[in-house]
Amino acid sequence: MTAQPDQTGSASGQIIISVDAMGGDAGPSVVVAGIAKSAKKNPQVGFILHGPEDTLKKLVAKRRVLDGRVVFRDCPDVVTMEDKPSQVVRNGKNTSMWSTLESVRNGEAAGAVSCGNTGALMALSMLRLRRLPGVTRPAIAILFPSGNPQGFNVLLDAGADIRADARDLLQYALMGASYARNGMNLLRPRVGLLNVGTEEHKGKAELKEAQALIAEYAERANYEFVGFVEGSDIPGKRCDVIVTDGFTGNVAIKTGEGTARMIGSLLREAFKYSPLSRLASLLAVTSLRRLSKRIDPRRVNGGVFLGLNGTVIKSHGSADDTGISAAVKLAFTLAQSGFAERLAARVASAAALTQDEAAPTGAQAEKQESR
C-alpha cells in the first residue's frame, strides 16, 4: 500500500514537488541522488516520488536527508524515449509520468519534474492539466547563460511545437515576459523576436506580423520590445527574453549546450599541454571554476512548460544528480513565487484584450445587424 502525504507538506511549511523517478537515461538512482541534493540545500522542499515503490524505497533509505520528506506512488509502467505520445495518451495511465502529473492536477504537489520523453510529457500535460484559457500552443522556456546582470536569458519555444504563427509568437512573448518577471525579478523584461537579421525587411511574413503584434502589446503587458534579434543575441545583453518557434529554439539550445561542453574540453586540453600551462591553470583555478560554473549546462537543466494549468519542468534525459537538483530548484522557485497563478492572470488579460479588439464597435455591430 502506498503511503499518503502528510497534508502535502503544507502543515510543515514545505512545498511539495512531484518527481518522475523513471524515464531518465541513468535510471532512478540518479533521480533519487538529485532530490537528495535538493533536500540537503533546501529544508522547505518535500517530494512525491513516482515509480516502482520497492525499488525507490531502497534507494531513498540510503539517503538520510530524505527521511520523512518523500511519499511514494507505486507505478508499474514507464514511458520510454521510443514511445509515441499518442500511445502514451491512450495507454499510459499506469506510468510514472502520468502519476507525476496527476499529483499536480489533484493539488497534492506544486509542480512536476520529469526526465522522460518530451513529446509524451507535453501530450500528457495537455491532457491532464489542460491549457490555460486563451493559449493555443504551450511552449517550453529555458534559461540560456548570458552577459546580462541576471546571468541568464529566457528562450522560448525550445521544442514544444515546431509550428508557430504570429499569434502564437505573441503568446510566447507574453508568457516569456511573465516568466522573466516572476522567475528572475525583472520588472520590465526586454523581449526580442529571433530572426535572420535585425532589419525590419528581413524574415518570413509571419515574423513581420508577429513583430507588429508584440510591439503593439508591449506597453499593456509591461515589457519592452527591442524588435528583431539574431542568434548572437541569445547569450548577449540586448534582451532578456528571446521568442522563436520550437524548431529554431531547440536547435539553438542544443547548439549552445554542445558549444559549452566543447569549450570546457578545449580548456582542459590547453592547460594540460605543458608544465607551464599546468602551472598557469593552478594560478587561475578560481577564475576557471567560476567560468566552468557559468557555462555548465547542468546548472540550467530544466525547461518550463508554459501555458498549462500547473507547473511542469522537463529535465534532460541525460541529467545527472546536479541537473536533477537544478530542475527541482526551478520548480520550487516558481511554486514559491506563485508563478502559475500570475501567468494565468497575464494570459487571461491578454486574451481579453484580443477579444475586445476583435469585437465589432457599435457602428460596426449595427452595420452587421442590418445585413
UniProtKB/Swiss-Prot annotation:
Gene Ontology MF term list: phosphate:acyl-[acyl carrier protein] acyltransferase activity
Entry's Gene Ontology cellular component terms: cytoplasm
Cell compartments where the protein resides: Cytoplasm
HAMAP family in alphabetical order: PlsX
Protein's name according to its UniProt entry: Phosphate acyltransferase
SUPFAM superfamilies assigned: Isocitrate/Isopropylmalate dehydrogenase-like
Its biological purpose: Catalyzes the reversible formation of acyl-phosphate (acyl-PO(4)) from acyl-[acyl-carrier-protein] (acyl-ACP). This enzyme utilizes acyl-ACP as fatty acyl donor, but not acyl-CoA.
Pfam family, one: FA_synthesis
Metabolic or biological pathway: Lipid metabolism; phospholipid metabolism
Main location: cytoplasm
InterPro entries listed in its UniProt record: FA_synthesis, Phospholipid_synth_PlsX-like
A biological process term (GO) from this entry: fatty acid biosynthetic process
Family: Belongs to the PlsX family.
Source organism (scientific name): Ruegeria pomeroyi (strain ATCC 700808 / DSM 15171 / DSS-3)
Cysteine pairings via disulfide bonds: none
Highest taxon of source: Bacteria
